[in-house]
Amino acid sequence: MTMTDPIADMLTRLRNANSAYHDSVTMPASKIKSHIAEILQQEGFITGWKTEDAEVGKNLTLELKFGPNRERSIAGIKRISKPGLRVYAKSTNLPKVLGGLGVAIISTSHGLLTDKQAGKKGVGGEVLAYVW
């Protein structure tokens, strides 16, 4: 069975593992998922990620980050642009997540960027997800 929205699947797996206090979560790998994982690591939502060769395909493993008393570093994740309803933002109208406390992941002509990086470069694009 083919997957309609692999990004939504990644975010759902991450949200469920975070809610269950798992230390890591594994999913099928792709380039865009690796770029999203890189942004999540840069912004401090996960401790690390790696791709592994499996018997069939590749797997992406994300290491979740928790505070000293097992507080979650990810309070919420929301998929914004979906296959049935794409959402785009101009460089002058980039979204702010929780007044700048969260991160919007945006697919631009310069690759995947956060809302802050896209604002500095002056580019807009497709708003993939919000993470806070």
Swiss-Prot record:
Molecular function per GO: rRNA binding; structural constituent of ribosome
A cellular component term, taken from the record's GO annotations: cytosolic small ribosomal subunit
GO BP field: translation
Cited Gene3D superfamilies: 3.30.1370.30, 3.30.1490.10
Top-level division of the source organism's lineage: Bacteria
Pfam families (alphabetical): Ribosomal_S8
Subunit comment: Part of the 30S ribosomal subunit. Contacts proteins S5 and S12.
NCBIfam families named among the record's database cross-references: PRK00136.1 (NF001109)
Function: One of the primary rRNA binding proteins, it binds directly to 16S rRNA central domain where it helps coordinate assembly of the platform of the 30S subunit.
HAMAP family in the cross-refs: Ribosomal_uS8_B
Family recorded in the similarity comment: Belongs to the universal ribosomal protein uS8 family.
Protein name: Small ribosomal subunit protein uS8
